[in-house]
């Protein structure tokens, strides 16, 4: 295993640490790559680089012009993820990719154990016992593991569950297959305890999508029937979903979106850069929030029409690589995992913005860039 491959695995470990440590750790890996003359060429050959770094450059200019210093800092995160994505593309191999997925699955176990510890502490502090499994509505009283908040951790779990499906297909060892199922179920249990309702929505699609991509037709049809049964059960008994009776957060989102549209109407072309909502809402006495809680609205709000077009151009180029590479033919399970990641982001994005953090942003970015392993040379 080369040094670059070892650095990829080290960076993977950093993703499960608090975001401050993760950011510094990945930055150090990029510095060593630059010193070894590995980074510049990687960026030059990065798919869609002109759109990605054109967008980042635009956001630096916009955030400075509007003194949006939170957004300025957030833009440096885009640089970090973009540069690491370039280094990843240059360094990743098929064998290292499988090891990386297994490492993520193993690390998720420790994150989940810590999440259970948090849940126990929160329960005791609020006069409850662990076995009551009472999930509070307050974000401060919900488990986050090593991540910023419950919803970000929940998205990480969504990604991990998809990886468990991927490795279940790729690994022929029966004991390993059983292990992946156990880890996925354990993570799903902890996901339930996060109280993130949004994170449960993708499960209505990711199983059929993945099974269709790996061409398991009978299981694909079975999964659709089971999904419909689960949806019917939830319809008949909504209390199965945690915090389902609390609609205050959805009412808050309506207020947030109304405030966001006011800002969009005033600054439609460029916005104010990342986290525009956080800077704008006090000016119109809007509902307090760090972002617009919808990636579609937040994209137009923060980046404007011009910035959003650049993001869409990059997304188009990256998806073109995914669909024109040999990924679907040579590794349908990886193609299925990519489609599931896209589905998770699109569904999750209806009610939240959870990609603007190093763990979720980097993890999603590198998986969607993994088709580079199957490009025709």
Per-segment meaning from a language model:
Residues 240, 247-258, 262-266, 270-303:
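Long extracytoplasmic/lumenal interhelical loops at the membrane interface
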């Amino acid at each position: 295993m080369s040094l670059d491959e070892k650095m990829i695995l080290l960076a993977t470990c950093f993703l499960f640490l608090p975001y401050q440590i993760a950011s510094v750790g990945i930055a150090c890996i990029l510095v060593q790559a630059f010193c070894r003359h590995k980074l510049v060429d990687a960026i030059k050959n990065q798919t869609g680089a002109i759109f990605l770094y054109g967008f980042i450059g635009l956001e630096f200019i916009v955030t400075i012009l509007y003194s949006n210093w939170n957004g300025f800092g957030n833009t440096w995160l885009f640089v970090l993820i973009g540069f690491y994505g370039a280094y990843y593309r240059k360094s990743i191999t098929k064998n290292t990719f499988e090891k990386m997925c297994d490492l993520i699955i193993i690390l998720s176990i420790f994150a989940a154990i810590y999440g259970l510890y948090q849940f126990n502490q929160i329960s005791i502090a609020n006069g409850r016992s662990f076995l009551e499994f009472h999930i509070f509505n307050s974000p401060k009283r919900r488990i986050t593991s090593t991540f910023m908040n419950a919803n970000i951790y929940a998205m990480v779990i969504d990604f991990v569950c998809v990886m468990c499906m991927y490795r279940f297909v790729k690994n022929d060892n029966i004991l390993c297959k059983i292990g992946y199922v156990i880890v996925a179920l354990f993570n799903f249990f902890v996901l339930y305890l996060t109280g993130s309702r949004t994170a449960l929505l993708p499960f209505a699609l990711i199983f059929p999508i993945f099974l269709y991509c790996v061409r398991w037709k009978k299981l694909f049809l079975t999964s659709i029937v089971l999904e419909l049964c689960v949806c019917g059960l939830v319809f008949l008994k909504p209390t199965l979903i945690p915090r389902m009776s609390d609609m205050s957060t959805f009412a808050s989102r309506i207020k947030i979106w109304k405030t966001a549209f006011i800002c969009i109407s005033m600054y439609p072309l460029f916005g104010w850069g990342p986290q525009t909502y956080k800077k704008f809402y006090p000016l119109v006495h809007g509902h307090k929030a760090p972002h617009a809680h919808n990636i579609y609205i937040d994209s137009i709000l923060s980046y404007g029409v011009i910035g959003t077009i650049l993001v869409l151009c990059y997304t188009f180029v990256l998806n073109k690589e995914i669909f024109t590479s040999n990924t679907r033919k040579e590794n349908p399970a990886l193609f299925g995992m990519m489609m599931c990641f896209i589905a998770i982001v699109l569904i999750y994005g209806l009610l939240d913005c959870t990609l603007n953090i190093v763990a979720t942003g980097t993890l999603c970015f590198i998986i969607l860039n993994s088709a580079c392993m199957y490009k025709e040379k």
